[in-house]
């Protein structure tokens, strides 16, 4: 009888603790950029790590792959933080179109991500997992190359490719133009081809060039040298293999990352593959931290 009463009290206490959990939008001001960004923050079990989840190129934390990732970790009891990069837009909430004026840089993105990690640490989180989708994975990988943080315990990259390569549509003449423009101190916006933006990516040379370091060789090298335990999750039916070649998966595996391939999934893990992604994310994390 006493044991049953104790169990009931424990269950009530657990329910009360979750009822006091925070879930909502938080803001952070970047002093050096004079910009404020928003993030969705949900507290979970304090004994579990916190997960920072980074969206892909020009999107927000409302993108369906990010929402699914957040939901998976939240349902498993993990604290989650999903920021939206400002891209030089104060409190940005919408995706940015190709033909908008792009003045943001990779360095600014990394500064924002780094300060969000600091934000989590100031909240008392001593175990942090970094999860990225698409270019969000590349940006996290680039950040980890320079940030040696004992509180970052695990990194999971999903749909990890690269941003610069003629096979992706990068035009060498446009790269040459941008370099010469900066040398001449001309930072006026210009139209480029960049990823899914065909001849209509309207960016300053500084902005455009900053992302070009994320080429095939750089991504593979950083992944090979990464000291943080890491996994890379890829969809077997990602259309980007048509551009980069199916040997990309072999090259990823050779870096030493723990490669997981979800059969049938596309770049965004759409439809039923969303659940496969969620299962893999939680399974990887639970196993790594010996969670039940």
Q: Where are the regions a protein language model picked out?
A:
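Alpha/beta-hydrolase active-site loop
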Residues: 100-123
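Gly/Ala-rich beta-loop-alpha elbow adjacent to hydrolase catalytic centers
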Residues: 131-136, 140
């Amino acid at each position: 009888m006493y044991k049953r009463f104790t169990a009931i009290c424990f269950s009530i206490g657990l329910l009360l603790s979750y009822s006091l959990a925070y879930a909502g939008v938080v803001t952070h001001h970047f002093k050096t950029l004079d910009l404020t960004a928003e993030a969705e923050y949900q507290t979970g079990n304090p004994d579990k790590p916190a997960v920072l989840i980074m969206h892909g190129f020009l999107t927000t934390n409302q993108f369906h792959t990010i929402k699914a990732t957040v939901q998976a970790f939240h349902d498993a009891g993990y604290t989650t933080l999903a920021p939206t990069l400002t891209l030089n837009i104060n409190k940005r909430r919408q995706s940015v179109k190709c033909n908008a004026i792009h003045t943001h840089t990779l360095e600014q993105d990394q500064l924002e991500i780094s300060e969000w990690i600091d934000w989590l640490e100031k909240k008392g989180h001593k175990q942090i997992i970094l999860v990225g989708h698409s270019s969000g994975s590349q940006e996290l990988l680039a950040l980890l190359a320079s940030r040696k943080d004992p509180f970052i315990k695990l990194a999971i990259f999903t749909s990890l490719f690269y941003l610069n390569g003629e096979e992706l549509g990068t035009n060498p003449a446009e790269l040459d133009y941008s370099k010469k423009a900066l040398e001449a101190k001309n930072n006026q916006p210009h139209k480029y081809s960049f990823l899914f933006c065909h001849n209509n990516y309207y960016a300053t040379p500084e902005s455009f060039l900053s992302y070009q370091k994320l080429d095939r060789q750089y991504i593979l090298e950083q992944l090979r040298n990464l000291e943080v335990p890491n996994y890379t999750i890829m969809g077997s039916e990602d259309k980007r293999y048509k551009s980069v070649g199916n040997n990309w998966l072999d090259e990823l595996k050779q870096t030493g990352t723990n490669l997981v391939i979800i059969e049938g999934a596309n770049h965004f893990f759409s439809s039923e593959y969303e659940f496969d992604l969620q299962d893999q994310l939680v399974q990887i994390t639970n196993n790594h931290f010996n969670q039940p």
